[in-house]
Curated annotation (Swiss-Prot):
This is 2-hydroxy-3-keto-5-methylthiopentenyl-1-phosphate phosphatase. It is an enzyme of class 3 (hydrolase). Signal peptide: none annotated. GO terms for biological process: L-methionine salvage from methylthioadenosine. One of its GO terms (molecular function) is 2-hydroxy-3-keto-5-methylthiopentenyl-1-phosphate phosphatase activity. It comes from Exiguobacterium sp. (strain ATCC BAA-1283 / AT1b).
Length: 216
């Protein structure tokens, strides 16, 4: 039996949700209602995020990337936490509802590409179009977009101890099957509502301290 860590990116590894930051900077006002519908779960993640990105002109692709790379801040303790997972022999995968054009550049030098699972954006048309290489399998009907439970079924052994780290509705379904959940933001209230045991955190130093305390 081994330990497998599945970690969110936006708002978890990074201080801000980068899709929200991108929309706030470049999208017309219609994005706000779409975002609210996703967060209150009246619109699926795939449908809502897809519609949000369709508001962005493709010819601004480089501006989007440059903006995010210049503003993204990694959450305190992340690099040290990665080193600790490696020293313990844990497998660490980033499973993100974010987009490849910013997730991969930000994690370069920290997480190998084969351990990053995220969405793809096609900028070949007039507006951005999200494609979904990790869509829901037959066991999930939530229209997740990047389906974290589906990915877990593919890469996590049934005998593994599964640790999930996340902050929002996109992490909720995978949190339901985790052995240990580290939560911040909206994920805390979702876990509380469903009675899912979780450990609140603000930085990765908090997670490291808790893991040492329980001798994980």
């Amino acid at each position: 039996m081994s330990t497998h860590v599945i970690c969110d990116f936006d708002g978890t590894i990074t201080e801000e949700d980068n899709i929200i930051a991108l929309m706030r900077r470049f999208a017309p006002p219609e994005w706000v209602e779409l975002k609210d519908s996703v967060l209150n779960q009246t619109l699926s993640i795939r449908e809502g995020v897809g519609q949000m990105f369709s508001l962005l002109p493709s010819n601004q692709q480089e501006r989007y990337r440059e903006f995010l790379q210049s503003t993204i801040t990694l959450r305190a303790g992340f690099v040290e936490f990665l080193q600790e997972t490696q020293s313990h022999g844990f497998r660490f995968d980033v499973v993100s509802g974010g987009m490849d054009f910013f997730v991969h550049p930000i994690l370069e030098g920290h997480v190998a590409p084969e351990h990053i699972f995220c969405n793809h954006v096609d900028f070949s048309g007039e507006t951005a179009r999200v494609t979904w290489p990790h869509a829901c399998d037959v066991h999930c009907l939530n229209d997740c977009g990047c389906c974290k439970p589906t990915i877990a079924r593919q890469i996590v052994s049934p005998t593994d101890t599964l640790i999930v780290i996340g902050d929002s509705v996109t992490d909720f379904e995978i949190a339901k099957r985790a052995d240990v959940v580290y939560a911040r933001g909206q994920l805390i209230s979702l876990c509380e509502a469903e009675g899912i045991r979780h450990v609140p955190f603000e930085t990765f130093y908090d997670i490291s301290a808790y893991m040492k305390g329980v001798n994980v």
